Amino acid sequence: MRAIHQIVAGYANGDAISNEVRVMRALFRSWGYASQIYSEQKRILPELRGEARDLAASRGDFRPEDVVLLHLSIGSDVNDLFPGLPGRKAILYHNITPPEYFRGVQEQTASLLDRGRRQAKALADSAEVVMADSRFNAEEIAAMGHANPQVLPLVLDFAMLRAKPDRRILRQYRDGMANILFVGRCAPNKKIEDLLN
């Protein structure tokens, strides 16, 4: 094995999967492997195009002795390209939200989620190793036909989480009131209304 390459549906700042692939790339490189991140060109944030490559234009980068890790999270052209790439294959499943949560709210997102779930089923038997970032997700991808998924918890850069708090912001919330912090996207499946109730 000379390289461990990762494939993601999109690459951005502040996104959990993008953050994880950055940490994993640094880890793979520290172990002595070449490692690149690939995505669809249109789904790579323009200012990050130096960090990630367009998969469709870079298929020649892959060799039979490489490991190719697909982060499976939504419908994408990269999911269709993955099985045809040379190299040993692995999938890390991050969950694909049921599209029903987005029907009538964000139809384009619902379509991508539906496509992703269909692609996840079609990818069964395409990888030697299948992982998921939680037991729930492992059970879900197993139900889609993937054999023996293992749990690999989210890989984090803990140094980034040790930032000093902003004293100005802390003062704003020292008013004796109860404060609730929601960390996540405001999206139908996150059920923020349950938190507010």
Regions found by a protein language model. Give the residues of each.
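A structural motif in glycosyltransferase catalytic domains
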Residues: 20-21, 180, 194-196
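Short hydrophobic "strand-cap" motifs at the C-terminus of beta-strands
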Residues: 7-8, 133, 155, 182-184
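Active-site helix-initiating loop/hinge in glycosyltransferases
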Residues: 16, 188-197
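Short amphipathic alpha-helix
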Residues: 17-28
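Nucleotide-activated donor-dependent transferases that construct or modify glycoconjugates
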Residues: 1-13
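Extended catalytic core of nucleotide-activated donor transferases of GT-like folds
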Residues: 45-126
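Conserved donor-binding/catalytic core segment of Leloir-type glycosyltransferases
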Residues: 131, 171-190
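Donor nucleotide-sugar binding/catalytic pocket of nucleotide-sugar-dependent glycosyltransferases
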Residues: 110, 121-167, 174
